[in-house]
Amino acid sequence: MGRVRTKTVKRAARQIVEKYYGKLGLDFQYNKKVAEEVALIPSKRMRNKVAGFITHLMRRIQKGPVRGISLKLQEEERERRMDYIPEKSELEVPVIQVDQDTADMLNFLKISLPNLKVMSFNAHEHRERH
């Protein structure tokens, strides 16, 4: 069974991961040496706990974004997704077929689309198609 990690261990590990992400890996022994170099950890036992949690966080980071840790790589990836502009607009189709109710709503909102075509749909036809 696992043990509960203290707030101190978690906070220290998160700060080390944020600042020294490039130096860390998935190996506990290597992370232990890096933690010893970059931080003043008072005891061997505390250092091992911090290194263990660093290794745990690194595994989680590989799977996806981790709450409470902001890495520049993740921030850039998120911004890239937010700024994505599709090559072809969904509105650039030859004809947009809508029913009369939708056309009335667009007119009410003062939205004019050049390729809009109003079609008459019957409830009976709609049921037969599905």
From Swiss-Prot:
Entry protein name: Small ribosomal subunit protein eS17
Recorded superkingdom: Eukaryota
GO cellular component terms given for this protein: cytosol; ribonucleoprotein complex; ribosome
One annotated GO biological process: translation
GO molecular function, one term: structural constituent of ribosome
UniProt cross-references to SUPFAM superfamilies, sorted A to Z: Rps17e-like
Native species: Theileria parva
Family membership noted in the UniProt record: Belongs to the eukaryotic ribosomal protein eS17 family.
